[in-house]
Amino acid sequence: MKVADATPTPCIDFSKIQSIINPPDLLKVQLDSFHNFIQDSVPLEKRKDQGLEKVLRSAFPITDTRGLYLLEYISYSFDKPKYTVEECIERGLTYDVSLKIKLKLSYKDEADEPDWKETIQQEVYLGRIPYMTDRGTFIINGAERVVVAQLHRSPGVVFSEAVHPNGKKMYSAKIVPTRGSWIEFQTDINNQIFVYIDQKKNFLVTALLRAIGFAKDEDILGLFDLVEEVEVSSKSSKREQLLGQYLASDIIDMTTGEVVPARAAITEEIIDQIVAAGYKTVKVMKTTSPEKGVDKSVIINTILNDSSATEEEALEIVYEELRSNEAPDIDAARSFLERTFFNQKKYDLGDVGRYRIQKKLQNELAELSAYLEKRPELKELSDAIYERILQTISTYSEEPIGEDILVLTHYDIIAVINYLIKLINGMAEVDDVDHLANRRVRSVGEQLAAQFVIGLARMGKNVREKLNSRDTDKIAPADLINARTVSSVVSSFFATSQLSQFMDQTNPLAEMTNKRRVSALGPGGLTRERAGFEVRDVHYTHYGRLCPIETPEGPNIGLISSLSVYAEINDKGFIQTPYRVVENGQVTDKVVMLSAEDEENKITVPVSIELDENNRIAAESVQARTKGDYPLVLAEEVNYMDVSPVQIVSAAAALIPFLEHDDGNRALMGANMQRQAVPLLVSEAPIVGTGMEAKVARDSRAVIVAEGPGVVQCVTADRIEVRYDLDPENNTVSLLDPDEGVKVYKLIKFKRSNQDTCISQRPLVHNGQRVNAGDVLADSSSTDNGELALGKNVLVAFMPWRGYNFEDAIVLSERLVYDDVFTSIHVHEFESSVRDTKRGEEQFTRDIYNVSEDALRNLDENGIVRIGAEVKERDILVGKITPKGESDPTPEEKLLRAIFGDKSSDVKDASMHVPAGMKGIVIKTKLFSRKKKIGMDVKERMEAIDKQFDLKEADLRSRFAKWMKQYLNGKKSVAITSDKGKVLVPEGTVIDEALLAKFNGLPFLESIDLSKGIVSGAKTNENVVRLIREYRLKLKDLSDERENEKYKINVGDELPPGIEELAKVYIAQKRKIQVGDKMAGRHGNKGVVGKILPIEDMPFMEDGTPVDIVLNPLGVPSRMNIGQLYETSLGWAGKKLGVKFKTPIFSGATYTEVQEYLEKAGLPGHGKVKLFDGRTGEQFHDEVTVGYIYMLKLSHLVDDKIHARSIGPYSLITQQPLGGKAQFGGQRFGEMEVWALEAYGAANILREMLTVKSDDVIGRNKTYEAIVKGQNLPEPGTPESFNVLIRELQGLGLEIRIDDRVP
């Protein structure tokens, strides 16, 4: 075995700016989200109210309608996965864990009894849920999948504007909850505010305020400070002032009982009536607010047009508009309104929604609160309404009301109306829906929580039905719960959701990008047909959060993005990016994470600005960034500074050297095409890199990294053993490990990826080598010395070559084929299964009737091809026979066949063959069977397993005892209590051998309350508690493992339903580069191989060195990706000097530095040299740009695309041949091709094309027969598509007859 060369090439770093912080783990997005949801490593008592815990708490308690039963939730736990990740992939199973919840069922005989009669506590199985691997993926039915994060509209309030055709602006405010009805307030052309609930019918906003409790006009007007008390007098000047105004409250003449209603326009007669009634002052409506002169006529217009005048009338209006029928009574209407907005089970703003409303309306809410303080009568009414809302919440929900109320309150509604008034007056701005403050990310944990909510709601419904149908006979929680309810919802999410994707595993970068992707599509998101330009465009808030470069090129452009390198997602789902704090021009080392909302209105500067020796901004004024603008500001005004030049882009874009010299469109292609690069036979890191290569390789988990300081103990081709240094005070590895700190790393060997590329690891270390934390122990098929290596450094010349590199085609040297430079390995998987059919069971066998011995030479006794066999198309991979026969055989026939072995008559050959166009070497075979073939009998195997695990448990106990003695012997204890509060060991007890022996007993350990500690020393306590927790965990793991091993023996191999045996064959193919393969650089410079030339025909330099690849120079200027020329020149200098370069984006090598290194290497500074034609030996007329460029071979290989058909499958209805390689289809002969044949007058060929070669069923059979017998071809018949047309016309009720009489 050859160990890979681990001596790294010296590297020259061009970075001008050192980043103050390192980027976070690039898979953190997936791993943190899932583990925060599942909280499996958190002790029960420390679990936060989030994720699964929160969902389960909200789903319980469940009661029946009679109030006799109460089912409460206590806690949940998981078992270990039954199979490893590799076993699940091989067997086509799901890598999952079983979820168990502890429930308590209480019951009583009569509902009015104060206490519960009896309670039963029980652990109930709730189904199996897929578990995330340490690479951030899920294994679902044997396929590795990724759940992509979704970018959707954040709950909260959004203000927008529209322009009516008459030019008037109309404003709207939409309150979007996490769950419940959408409510929209909208102004119209008549200057009124309407309310739309769930986009249904509308009613005036005053009706809603009235229905909530502000019953009188005066109350509503008072809320907006629109009531004015005016003196009434007989003086003409005062009378004129009153004329035309509207009354704010009713005027009652006590003597006559006459009423002048509110909203009445004041006339001379009304003034006389008011004076006659003895009123000195009267309350009228005013249109502007006195302090600020704000026009609030919209409220007055709305009130004047409101048909309701009392709370009851308003409730009826709201009910009728929403339910489209009359309310049975007022109480029903009121409870309907309360259920819609104040019941937390029906209407939930969520933490995010409440936070967004408070943040957006903070000024309006503060102003409202201050105003109510000045108006005691309104404050009293408002407080009474608030109390009623709180009462409603507690009626519908048993949960205590937290700090923030997650339902809508009247304060929110009034604040929204106030903000709308500000918008009308031009005193506020509408929201930008594409701003990242209004869009949040739903990562995997939140999406799973939503599925659990659906599943538990269904389960709750079933439980209630069961409880209601039960009499008071004794039942246990397990009788009520159906595990399928929840697990089926979760399984269908992983299998069918648009956001659960088959992982792109072409190379480690593709894998990682897939996990860091953010999609605006999916359930509850946008659809690509409806998404406009604005939502797809780059927004200024994307800076440092979403990559402006990496996005797909097709219909999904802009809808699918990638997280930037430093971006993180906070607990509310908003994307944050780090900034250094700047105070009065002084750049500090304090780093803060800012969301788009936090950054709004702040002034930030790039990391490239000049600082003096004291870290102050050197210039007096600098160009900064604020919102979408780039003003020149004073250094003292700057708030924040970027942390790194890489901050703006994603990992894939950060791998493109000289990105700053490339056009954005080409950089996009470069970032996308790196993900399609096929791992090559021998990986080679780029000479010109950006410094991100190692980060991507580590964070994608492609390489194996040392976890701490230690010594390599053993290295083979497929395993590395490292003995880590044990430090009892600060242990990086488990103290309870049976191997005393030795960790074994199994290397992946020739594993097939999802895209059929080959994943294989090779060791980089040797026996006895000392390693430290973070050292790379093993490389992957796409890494070189721990750096991402997707392609090869090849000698390039930019020149035309006899037209063969026209239109981006590429001319290659034959050397690249001979030396396997661009050769890749592809592993294909084939599977065949045995099922139990109605006519009997199928069988794997090499005994196949009517097949020559030569065809069976590579099959073993089970009929499976041997490892190492070279196979080509049509070779048998798995021999299989399947029963045939029109009728089921009688018992007598079965007996006779069993005796005489007459197999030929009743079985047919169903063997699996190598498909067309495939050849390769069998590298692995697997046979799984439900009927396990065991050498020893089951009982003996069980006993052996018990013995093995007893030894492991005894070893674990002795290790635990040893470390406990080391930590505790002779120390004084604190008061050790049980989890029920009972004192187990009094305070001050000296811990001796006897007490330590007690600790070894599991019942004693299980009952201890660890939160109080064991001894007084903090560090010792921490170590002991960690040791006890780990001991408990390891014992449980051993117990689970024991059960799993026994289960496997009893059951045999677990296979998908209906399959008795499963055979898998893996074939490895070596694919050399050939004409038609697609290649690309990292700058979006892609092309297809147009010609492979003999080495002697390639252009060569003065010293006779032929170039490896010739690219067309016309592919550079119009594409504006000059980065490839910088890379070419610097790569050549690096090759000559034997060094590598690290040129990070936006702070890398300059033109002068590239020239400097070219000259240092003895090369011309402009990078151009004389070249000679390999065919004639003559010098080319001009000098040519030559150098080393990093080229990738992409997964668009001609072998997978080339396809031809003679006969094959036909479409069922039209009887025309199918299309596409996957269906073994034909080439479409379209209308333009028909024109071409018409133009040549090729009538017979045309007739053949449209009939016998297409869908004339009878004609094609006759033609085939004629060809076989060597006869003349018959006349074509009627095409089937004509019959289809006739049937369709008949389906429309038209009678069509074919008149085939010749006139």
UniProtKB/Swiss-Prot annotation:
A molecular function GO annotation: DNA-directed RNA polymerase activity
GO biological process terms on file: DNA-templated transcription
Cross-referenced CDD domains: RNA_pol_B_RPB2 (cd00653)
InterPro entries: DNA-dir_RNA_pol_bsu_ext_1_sf, DNA-dir_RNA_pol_bsu_external_1, DNA-dir_RNA_pol_su2, DNA-dir_RNAP_su2_dom, DNA-dir_RNAP_su2_hyb_sf, RNA_pol_bsu_bac, RNA_pol_bsu_CS, RNA_pol_bsu_protrusion
Pfam families attached to this UniProt entry: RNA_pol_Rpb2_1, RNA_pol_Rpb2_2, RNA_pol_Rpb2_3, RNA_pol_Rpb2_45, RNA_pol_Rpb2_6, RNA_pol_Rpb2_7
EC assignment: 2.7.7.6
A GO CC term assigned to this protein in UniProt: DNA-directed RNA polymerase complex
Catalytic activity: RNA(n) + a ribonucleoside 5'-triphosphate = RNA(n+1) + diphosphate
Bilayer-spanning residue ranges: none
Keywords (A to Z) from UniProt: DNA-directed RNA polymerase, Nucleotidyltransferase, Transcription, Transferase
Function statement: DNA-dependent RNA polymerase catalyzes the transcription of DNA into RNA using the four ribonucleoside triphosphates as substrates.
Subunit and interaction comment: The RNAP catalytic core consists of 2 alpha, 1 beta, 1 beta' and 1 omega subunit. When a sigma factor is associated with the core the holoenzyme is formed, which can initiate transcription.
Family: Belongs to the RNA polymerase beta chain family.
Record NCBIfam families: PRK00405.1, rpoB
Name of the molecule in the record: DNA-directed RNA polymerase subunit beta
Organism, as annotated: Chlorobaculum tepidum (strain ATCC 49652 / DSM 12025 / NBRC 103806 / TLS) (Chlorobium tepidum)
